């Protein structure tokens, strides 16, 4: 519940991240009907049964390391299981997007829409619409539970209607243009997270005992994912564990072909001293799908 998930706001670092941690909000967002603000970012995590909703706003929560769930305006999600072994979120109404930058076979990440469970299997970008129940795979692979222990796979650029009585067959869809606000916002968030990665990765990755996982950026004021090796997000933004990134893109729209190398927020804040002097040691590492490691020094 809210009281159990609300953590004290430290001066320099957020609490260690776990599935359900609120990573970003803009506009009107609520947890179990209580309004959220920027002080909750990184310091508030959803427990089982909690509902996060938006009005004229948006929100982003962390799932397992490397997976972000983004909640569109006028939407709501309920946390079913905030565990590393089973991470399950139900879309009550509205739309959500899920960016998967890292996933292991040991992970079991599921999105429930209209009572139907969809398991995310590969890295990529996914959207779910509870108002018109459907699962869309822009890039990646998902498996929809259709009953009797059977699953219907959804591949790149395919969607599946999730309403009862609908045809259990995926259909190809044409990726929507830049008018898709949720997609474009997710791409922008991915860009900002890549900038945060570029900003702090060198300070963390060169430290002793580095493990890939969630790491707190005190300047962007959110968690970003630092992996063991370089990778691209589904939107083409490069994440490099030793700093530096550039963009590519899958869909030829949004931010295709743009990006940065050596950009971000370097220069004005004396970051290296802030990290080490402020006790930013270790991190939210993730080992082979089994759990978090390390921790945030304070």
In which residue ranges do the predicted regions lie?
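Bacterial N-terminal signal peptides
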Residues: 1-8
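Extracytoplasmic low-complexity, disordered linker/stalk tracts in cell-surface/secreted proteins
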Residues: 265-298
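Flexible, surface-exposed loop/linker segments and immediately adjacent secondary-structure boundaries
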Residues: 11-203
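Residue-level marker of positions within ordered structural domains that often coincide
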Residues: 1, 27, 230
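Low-complexity segments
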Residues: 171-277
């Amino acid at each position: 519940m809210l009281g159990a998930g609300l953590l004290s706001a430290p001066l320099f670092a957020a609490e260690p991240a776990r599935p359900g941690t609120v990573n970003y909000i803009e506009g009107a967002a609520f947890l179990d009907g209580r309004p959220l603000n920027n002080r909750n970012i990184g310091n508030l995590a959803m427990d089982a049964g909690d509902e996060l909703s938006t009005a004229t706003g948006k929100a982003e929560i962390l799932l397992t390391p490397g997976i972000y769930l983004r909640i569109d305006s006028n939407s709501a999600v309920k946390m079913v299981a905030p565990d590393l072994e089973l991470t399950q979120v139900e879309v009550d109404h509205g739309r959500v997007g899920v960016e998967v930058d890292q996933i292991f076979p040991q992970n079991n990440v599921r999105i429930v829409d209209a009572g139907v469970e969809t398991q995310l299997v590969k890295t990529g970008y996914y959207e779910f619409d509870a108002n018109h129940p459907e699962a869309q795979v822009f890039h990646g692979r998902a498996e929809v539970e259709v009953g009797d222990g059977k699953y219907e796979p959804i591949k790149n650029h395919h969607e599946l209607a999730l309403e009862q009585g609908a045809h259990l067959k995926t259909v190809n869809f044409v990726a929507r243009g830049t008018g898709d606000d949720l997609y474009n916002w997710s791409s922008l968030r991915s860009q900002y997270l890549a900038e945060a990665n570029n900003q702090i990765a060198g300070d963390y990755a060169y430290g002793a005992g580095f493990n890939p996982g969630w790491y707190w950026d005190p300047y962007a004021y959110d968690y970003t994912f630092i992996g063991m090796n370089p990778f691209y997000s589904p939107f083409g933004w490069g994440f490099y564990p030793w700093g530096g990134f550039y963009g590519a893109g899958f869909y030829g729209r949004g931010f295709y072909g743009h990006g940065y190398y050596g950009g971000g927020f370097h220069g004005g804040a004396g970051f290296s001293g802030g990290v080490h002097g402020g006790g930013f040691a270790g991190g939210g590492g993730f080992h082979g799908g089994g759990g978090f490691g390390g921790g945030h020094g304070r």
